[in-house]
Regions:
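Short beta-strand element of the alpha/beta-hydrolase
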Residues: 25-33
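N-terminal cap/lid segment of alpha/beta-hydrolase-fold proteins
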Residues: 1-22
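Catalytic nucleophile-loop/oxyanion-hole region of alpha/beta-hydrolase
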Residues: 65-91
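Alpha/beta-hydrolase fold nucleophile elbow
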Residues: 91-99
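The serine-hydrolase catalytic nucleophile loop
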Residues: 35-47, 191
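Gly/Ala-rich beta-loop-alpha elbow adjacent to hydrolase catalytic centers
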Residues: 98-106
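Conserved alpha/beta-hydrolase
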Residues: 47-69
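The alpha/beta-hydrolase serine catalytic core
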Residues: 16, 111, 116-237
């Protein structure tokens, strides 16, 4: 399952680092969650899925994570969305898979550039987290995550998060969409995925509620890939 490293240089000396596998289109693109990195259990499973189908695959560390530049808590969500679009411009129309914060970023990127997203899979997407970010912070301004490091959230990041138009987002998503959420997720409530799915403006959409599924959803990854591949792309939004 060999992949090759790549780097995308950004303005002001920033950069994104990832790895990719050459293969047939559409490529699978994976966006990880907050405090995570590109090389995780789900992305490894998706890479294996891509290899068995001789399809392209790409994953990258979002800024503030892993080998990419920036510090956690210092990069705005709007910047992460712009970065994701830059990556998709590299691959062309892709099957975009986002987990948690990566799901939120993927949804915004798909809404902004539907021409670059053939299908969209959102795994426990972090809807509701950003508009209410100040409620999540401690008095010291730190965000305490369930499975990652605690970190200070810069004022510009808070302001950007609160300004995101999340309420109108579902209606702007006009691509085939799979939303997956577990009933035992103690990080992001199931209700936000139900709300998002109901508003998606494409006829080919599915909400899969995983009984006893946690926030990571690692145990059902193989079925997730099957379901996103099964989404119909030849129907009108």
């Amino acid at each position: 399952m060999a992949t090759s490293l790549f780097r995308i240089d950004l303005p002001e000396g920033h950069h994104i680092v990832g790895d990719e596998r050459a293969g047939d289109d559409p490529c699978y693109v994976f966006l990880h969650g907050l405090g995570s990195v590109r090389a995780g259990e789900k992305s490894a499973s998706l890479l294996d899925h891509a290899q068995h189908r001789d399809r392209g695959f790409l994953r990258f560390d979002m800024r503030g994570h892993g080998e990419s530049s920036g510090e956690l808590g210092q990069v705005t969500v709007s910047e992460l969305i712009d970065d994701a679009i830059r990556v998709l411009e590299r691959t062309g129309p892709a099957v975009v898979v986002g987990s948690s914060l990566g799901g939120l970023v993927a949804a915004h990127a798909a809404a902004a550039r539907p021409d670059l997203c053939e299908r969209l899979a959102l795994l426990a997407p972090a809807f509701g987290l950003m508009p209410n970010i100040r409620r999540q912070l401690g008095q010291d301004g730190f965000l305490h995550t369930s499975d990652g490091p605690s970190f200070f959230v810069a004022p510009r990041v808070r302001d950007d998060a609160e300004a995101l138009d999340e309420r109108g987002l579902p209606a702007r998503v006009r691509v085939p969409t799979l939303v997956v959420h577990g009933t035992a997720d103690d990080t992001i409530p199931l209700q936000v995925s139900e709300w998002f799915h109901a508003g998606v403006a494409h006829a080919s959409k599915e909400l899969w509620v995983v009984a006893d599924g946690d926030h990571r959803l690692n145990t059902v990854a193989t079925e997730i890939w099957r379901r996103v591949d099964a989404l119909t792309t030849d129907v009108k939004p």
